[in-house]
Design a protein with these regions (language model features):
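Short acidic, glycine/serine/threonine-rich loops at helix termini
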Residues: 77-82, 117-119
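A glycine-rich phosphate-binding loop feature that marks nucleotide/adenosyl-phosphate handling sites
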Residues: 25, 75-77, 134-135
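N-terminal glycine-rich flavin-associated loop
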Residues: 11, 34-66, 88-133
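Conserved PLP cofactor-binding pocket of PLP-dependent enzymes
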Residues: 69
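N-terminal accessory segments
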Residues: 1-33, 58-66
Length: 135
């Protein structure tokens, strides 16, 4: 428990975003859409790229794994694990750059497929991977 508290305190000093190491948050993030349930060390909801870098640096300095997480819709357990979960879906969910002529887009990691395709649709484009979930 003391190690978890020290890790949470170090993350709170390092990031501007949310740091959640409470039992309820850990319970909510222990599952995805699969049958697996593994309690995370805690959760960081980064506000920006600097928060992501800071969280990874704190984790590395403390020997903790980091697991990026989107919507938690994995059907095979990729988004659960005994790690610090980085949930970018709240603040880092925008289209950053789009070039219609060259047909490319740069997005933040929390943007979901349906939102990307809604952005691209007026330009007659679609990002076509067929994933199990897209919202």
């Amino acid at each position: 428990m003391q190690v978890r508290d020290e890790l949470a305190a170090a993350l709170q000093r390092a990031v501007k975003g949310e740091v959640r190491f409470d039992a309820v948050s850990r319970m909510l993030y222990r599952t995805d859409a699969s049958i697996y349930a593994i309690e995370p060390l805690g959760l960081v909801v980064p506000r920006d790229e600097d928060d992501v870098a800071a969280a990874i640096a704190v984790a590395a300095a403390n020997g903790a794994a980091v697991l990026p997480r989107g919507g938690g819709t994995s059907l095979a357990g990729q988004s659960v694990g005994a790690a610090i979960h980085l949930d970018c879906s709240k603040y880092m969910n925008r289209v950053l750059e789009f070039n219609a002529e060259e047909r490319w887009v740069r997005v933040q990691p929390g943007l979901v497929l349906d939102e990307l395709n809604a952005y691209l649709q007026p330009h007659g484009l679609v990002f076509a991977p067929d994933v199990s979930t897209s919202s």
